[in-house]
Amino acid sequence: MADKAPFDTDISTMTRFVMEEGRKAGGTGEMTQLLNSLCTAVKAISTAVRKAGIAHLYGIAGSTNVTGDQVKKLDVLSNDLVMNMLKSSFATCVLVSEEDKNAIIVEPEKRGKYVVCFDPLDGSSNIDCLVSIGTIFGIYRKKSTDEPSTKDALQPGRNLVAAGYALYGSATMLVLAGGSGVNSFMLDPAIGEFILVDKNVKIKKKGNIYSLNEGYAKDFDPAVTEYIQKKKFPPDNSSPYGARYVGSMVADVHRTLVYGGIFLYPANKKSPDGKLRLLYECNPMAFIMEKAGGMATTGKEAILDIVPTDIHQRAPVILGSPDDVQEFLEIYKKHAVK
């Protein structure tokens, strides 16, 4: 038997994958430019996250962002990286970031046809204790022929062209959803490229894990309380669901995608509109889930059907395996008619 080569000489990198998909779709190449630029930003953030302690990037930068979270030094760095790389891709016209109060309109000489909404460093409250954090993004096509403005970003999630997230965990993974489904890429630090490791990812029809912050249990809606009780104490004496909650949306949603189950950040008495942001947290994750065969809902409607009125709008979110989300919806509807 012939010896195997020391490494694969025909690897499918993310750059190659995106170029092939663009060619199949007869595209202009702008999406390829955009995603390649985003990839560069993710690689740079990954490096910064891993050497944060040495580079004194831990700690607070001394301000709060528009949604009231304390801004960490890494947040500022990550936001600048993503913002600068997207502007220089010549593929974007409007950029919405969790860290900026207003939408950023790209300079006329650098404009392209895409609108990008992103959270540069999700879960950053976990930075100091080395818990996995990530970057989330959603890409829309500009619909109007008018001068670019904030209203170009106020599109429902159904209009997303592509969405994804990067997870900075034991390895750096980039999950991308688009016309060809959901695909996962792992960063190979030896060659500095994202390598395709999972093609056409699908979520399990039903899982056995639930994920939510039970610290807010006293403020839960009755429907949420009943659903969680049912998972802990199944009426048919079947095995109870396991509970897993990191507190970093990217980490919790990624685990849900890989193992199946349900992730919940529902509305409660203190946060009647939910806590997670629609444009750059809920919509991209809902898009990925639906492309992987899962579901994503507020309880009242599909996440992707919400027409936003504000770039920092919040929404409740329940997403995951279709059977699990459907079971939650049945309980939710039962309580809604009471």
UniProtKB/Swiss-Prot annotation:
Which InterPro entries does this one have?
Answer: FBPase_C_dom, FBPase_class-1, FBPase_N, FBPtase, Fructose_bisphosphatase_AS
Provide the residue positions that the database annotates as binding substrate: 122-125, 213-216, 244-249, 265, 275-277
Q: GO cellular-component terms in the record?
A: cytoplasm; cytosol
Entry EC no(s): 3.1.3.11
Q: How is the cofactor bound?
A: Binds 3 Mg(2+) ions per subunit.
- What metabolic or biological pathway is this protein involved in? Carbohydrate biosynthesis; gluconeogenesis
Regulation (activators, inhibitors):
Subject to complex allosteric regulation. The enzyme can assume an active R-state, or an inactive T-state. Intermediate conformations may exist. AMP acts as an allosteric inhibitor. AMP binding affects the turnover of bound substrate and not the affinity for substrate. Fructose 2,6-bisphosphate acts as a competitive inhibitor. Fructose 2,6-bisphosphate and AMP have synergistic effects.
**Molecular function in Gene Ontology:** AMP binding; fructose 1,6-bisphosphate 1-phosphatase activity; identical protein binding; metal ion binding; monosaccharide binding
Q: Where does AMP bind?
A: 18-22, 28-32, 113-114, 141
GO BP of this protein: cellular response to magnesium ion; cellular response to xenobiotic stimulus; fructose 1,6-bisphosphate metabolic process; fructose 6-phosphate metabolic process; fructose metabolic process; gluconeogenesis; negative regulation of cell growth; negative regulation of glycolytic process
Q: What is this protein called?
A: Fructose-1,6-bisphosphatase 1
Species of origin = Oryctolagus cuniculus
